Amino acid sequence: MSPKILSEDEILSVLRLLKEHIQTRYKVTRIGVFGSVARGEASPESDVDIVVEMEPNLFLRADLKAELTARFGRPVDVIRYRQEMNSRLKSQIDMEAHYV
């Protein structure tokens, strides 16, 4: 049985519920969703692309990724948004991301 397709609204609802916890535990100042979920093109095989604004800390980002993967029951990519990042990815995030 394929995993359920999670809608953008479902993802954002969970992120809203977890926002204070995520800000405190992971030092995240902003969190949102982008990619296929934000475009309404997610399939059962799609991962969830999450964008965060936070200080560079690979350990905290890895822990956040693990927590969200467990919460959503599917692979999650956590991308740290910053001024000096891949310009194509930055443009995609700028166009697609919806934040809580």
Q: Which residues make up each language-model segment?
A:
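Catalytic core of pol beta-like nucleotidyltransferases
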Residues: M1-R30, A38-P44, M54-V100
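Conserved histidines in hydrophobic membrane contexts and catalytic metal-binding motifs
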Residues: V33
